[in-house]
């Protein structure tokens, strides 16, 4: 899958999640590539693009180990429940070394999950992960 198609699928997923949750679930979505000690921002939607890049390692917080370990499979995702502010709430593996970062810059995942509508809002997210399992993102050199 191309980055262009991936970003369209991500935007559609975000729209579905927000509709089911009746408010914005994640106000920040980023597709990144990690290789060795280098990272590249491939796509971004949110309120703080330059700060996202500048503060990436700090904001990765509790998710940093999972992101950098490199042992997750395509389609796998991880959440942290107690990250607040600009700390990332989730990541999903889109392809080899390619990740989706999801963040709510206002609420923690714990606060989001307390709303009963969160259960239904998760469905599009899981469906998105299945799409990447079937067709991972492949970066063109």
Positions of PLM-derived features:
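An N-terminal domain-start capping segment
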Residues: 1-4, 57-60, 119-128
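A charged amphipathic helix-loop-strand protein-protein interaction module that recurs
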Residues: 3-16, 42-87
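Generic non-transmembrane alpha-helical segments
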Residues: 9-20, 24, 119-124, 128
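Short N-terminal helix-loop-first-beta-strand/juxtamembrane motif that initiates sensory/input modules
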Residues: 19-39
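Short glycine-rich, low-complexity/disordered patches
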Residues: 23-30, 74-81, 134-141
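Hydrophobic beta-strand residues in large extracellular and virion-surface proteins
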Residues: 31-32, 41-45, 91, 99-101
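Sensory/regulatory domains in signal-transduction proteins
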Residues: 70-117
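Juxtadomain coupling helices with adjacent low-complexity linkers
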Residues: 106-141
């Amino acid at each position: 899958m191309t980055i262009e198609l991936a970003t369209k699928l991500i935007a559609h997923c975000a729209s579905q999640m927000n509709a089911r949750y009746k408010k914005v679930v994640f106000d920040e979505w980023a597709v990144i590539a990690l290789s060795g000690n280098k990272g590249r921002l491939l796509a971004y939607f949110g309120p703080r693009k330059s700060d996202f890049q500048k503060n990436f390692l700090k904001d990765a917080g509790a998710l940093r180990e999972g992101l950098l370990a490199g042992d997750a499979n395509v389609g796998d995702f991880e959440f942290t429940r107690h990250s607040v502010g600009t700390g990332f709430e989730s990541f999903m593996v889109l392809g080899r070394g390619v990740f989706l970062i999801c963040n709510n810059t206002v609420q923690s995942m714990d606060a989001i999950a307390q709303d009963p509508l969160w259960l239904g809002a998760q469905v599009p997210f899981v469906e998105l992960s299945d799409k990447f399992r079937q067709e991972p993102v492949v970066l063109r050199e």
